[in-house]
């Protein structure tokens, strides 16, 4: 997540990452303090199960995880490829970057990778975008589906406890 602004979205995304085993990368500056009650409440009691890494800036993130050397995609309403048209099944590690709720990803980043690494979720042309946490969940579960939900429990035993 690049410069997220809404604490509840980040909490929901943290919960999705924790329950799926995905690593959450937070790129600063954040629009809130990560210890805020709204963030913690949205993530429930999953915070101690979350693999999280924070980065000082988008530049610091891209320097560490180079797009050309990694399976990296940029989720945007301006994307050229549907997220379902990517074959993730042969990718061991996948990075999907999402921008801030009000502006999305930086324009310079989209211009650089628009034709090669941008993905989008199809939607009606008359509306702006889905909620960020919903978008993260949709794309995360497509990647997991293509990996046959590896390491995830497909039937519930929660009620048996």
Predicted feature residues:
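Post-transcriptional modification and biogenesis factors for structured RNAs
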Residues: 1-161
């Amino acid at each position: 997540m690049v410069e997220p602004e809404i604490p509840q979205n980040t909490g929901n995304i943290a919960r999705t990452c924790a329950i799926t085993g995905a690593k959450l990368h937070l790129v600063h500056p954040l629009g809130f303090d990560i210890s805020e009650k709204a963030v913690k409440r949205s993530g429930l009691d999953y915070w101690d199960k979350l693999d999280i890494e924070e980065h000082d800036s988008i530049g610091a993130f891209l320097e560490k995880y180079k797009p050309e050397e990694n399976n990296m995609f940029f989720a945007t309403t301006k994307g050229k490829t549907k997220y379902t048209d990517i074959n993730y099944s042969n990718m061991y590690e996948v990075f999907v970057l999402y921008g801030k709720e009000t502006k999305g990803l930086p324009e310079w980043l989209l211009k650089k990778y628009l034709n090669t690494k941008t993905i989008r979720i199809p939607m009606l042309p008359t509306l702006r975008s889905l909620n960020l946490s919903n978008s993260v969940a949709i794309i995360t579960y497509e990647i997991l589906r293509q990996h046959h939900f590896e390491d995830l429990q497909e039937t519930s035993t929660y009620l048996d406890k």
